[in-house]
């Protein structure tokens, strides 16, 4: 005898069907989350605030990559280069023109959109590994241009950027940055959620499945691909601008290839094709190295292995990626969905917690 499963379609209005928050339970949990996020900066110390700000910064780029790879199915290995586009656009405008924040941020976004248009063109002819290699070229080209600028201007330690001012308030402490980055991250998620429900977002999902079928349905595949690259690159470049201001300097050495790998891991570990997966993957990628270092401190191994901490973090990071690819290809969001299904079916069935 099989366990009964939840069934039925309980929405009776179109407004209910298109609502972002569809149930009372979701409203309650979102309210709790909003209260927790609002109260966090008043309870956290400077270290926790810095970690939270890093999570918010990375989440913008992770959502952008999820739109491109997770929904549109276009592989990109140039994410660190896109961050560098936004950061160097900000640094050059500040250094050469003393441009304020309200100019450098949109300028960085426009620069990212132009780069996305140019480097999205190969996606019209290339797929898979070949497309990945073409986007990897973006990384090295941008970093080379950044290094040339630093060399010609004699900036051996990078471009130093003063803290920006927003509505008359200088962003000099972690709490002020937390508010700005939380607003930016929330806006990115809401924009992405609504974009995925438009004609453009549905075309991305279609070309991810099978391009020939999408084209037969009347979808202009080249336009869909280019729009995915442009939107993703715009958001990522804007995140690079915010990262440059938050760190207070811009340098080509701050964007190694490992940053791209971290963002790809965010998508894989979080779960392909889910914005929630991008956010869960961001938490994992940012907090996992901290957990490794805390474990080493607890075991008293920090002094002995101090010179190997970075290598240990990278090795543990690689092992985690392999384990997720082999044993949990749906990522953290897959685990979360099975937990939800378990509570939905309880006490009649607990099968969803096992392997599907």
Positions of the model-derived regions?
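Transmembrane alpha-helices and adjacent helix-loop boundaries
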Residues: 2-356
């Amino acid at each position: 005898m099989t366990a009964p499963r939840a069934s039925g379609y309980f929405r009776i209005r179109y407004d209910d069907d298109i609502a972002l928050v569809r149930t009372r339970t979701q409203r309650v949990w979102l309210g709790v989350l909003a209260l927790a996020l609002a109260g966090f900066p008043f309870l956290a110390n400077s270290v926790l605030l810095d970690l939270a700000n890093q999570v918010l910064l990375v989440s913008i780029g992770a959502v952008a990559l999820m739109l491109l790879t997770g929904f549109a199915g276009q592989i990109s290995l140039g994410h660190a280069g896109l961050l560098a586009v936004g950061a160097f656009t900000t640094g050059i405008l500040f250094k050469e023109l003393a441009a304020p924040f309200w100019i450098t941020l949109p300028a960085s976004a426009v620069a990212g959109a132009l780069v996305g248009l140019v480097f999205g063109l190969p996606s019209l002819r290339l797929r898979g590994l070949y497309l990945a290699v073409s986007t990897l070229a973006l990384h090295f080209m941008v970093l080379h241009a950044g290094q040339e600028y630093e060399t010609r201007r004699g900036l051996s330690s990078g471009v130093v950027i003063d803290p920006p001012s927003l509505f008359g308030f200088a962003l000099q402490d972690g709490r002020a940055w937390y508010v700005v980055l939380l607003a930016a991250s929330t806006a990115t998620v809401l924009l992405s959620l609504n974009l995925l429900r438009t004609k453009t977002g549905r075309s991305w999902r279609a070309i991810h499945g099978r391009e020939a079928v999408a084209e037969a349905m009347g979808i202009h595949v080249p336009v869909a691909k280019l729009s995915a690259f442009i939107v993703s690159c715009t958001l990522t470049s804007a995140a690079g601008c915010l990262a440059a201001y938050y760190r207070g300097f811009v340098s080509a050495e701050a964007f190694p290839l490992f940053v791209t790998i971290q963002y790809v891991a965010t998508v894989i570990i979080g779960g392909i094709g889910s914005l929630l997966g991008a956010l869960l993957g961001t938490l994992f990628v940012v907090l996992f190295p901290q957990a490794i270092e805390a474990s080493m401190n607890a075991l008293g191994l920090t002094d002995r292995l101090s010179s190997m901490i970075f290598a240990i973090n990278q090795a543990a990071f690689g092992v985690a990626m392999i384990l997720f690819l082999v044993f949990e290809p749906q990522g953290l969001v897959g685990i979360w969905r099975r937990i939800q299904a378990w509570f939905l079916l309880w006490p009649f069935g607990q099968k969803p917690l096992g392997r599907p």
